[in-house]
Amino acid sequence: MVTALQRTPVAAVVGRQLLRSGTAVGANYREALRSRSKSEYAAKMNIGLMELEESSYWLELLDEGRISTGAEVKALHAEANELSAIFVSMIRKAGLGANSAGKF
C-alpha cells in the first residue's frame, strides 16, 4: 500500500511513518509472546497498542489529507481498530487488569 502512494514529499513522509509504526506492531507482539514476565508482556503489548494508535493516525492523515482515499485505507484503518481491541483484550485476559490496557 505504501509503495502505491503518490510520489510527493508529503506522501513519502506519511508512508514512511505508517510503514514504521505498522511493522512495529508485529515486532512488539512477537516480543510479547517471548516475554519472561507478566510485566514485560504488558509493556510490549502496550507498546504494540501505541503503535496501532500511531498507525491509525497516519491512516487518518492519508484519508483526510486526500493523499490516498481508497477503500484500502479505510479497510486498514478498520483492521487497526480491530487489532487495538484484540490487544486490549489480550492484556486484560493475561490478568493484568483493565487499568493496564491503554495506559501508557
Predicted region positions:
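Short, C-terminally biased terminal segments at protein or domain edges
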Residues: 1-104
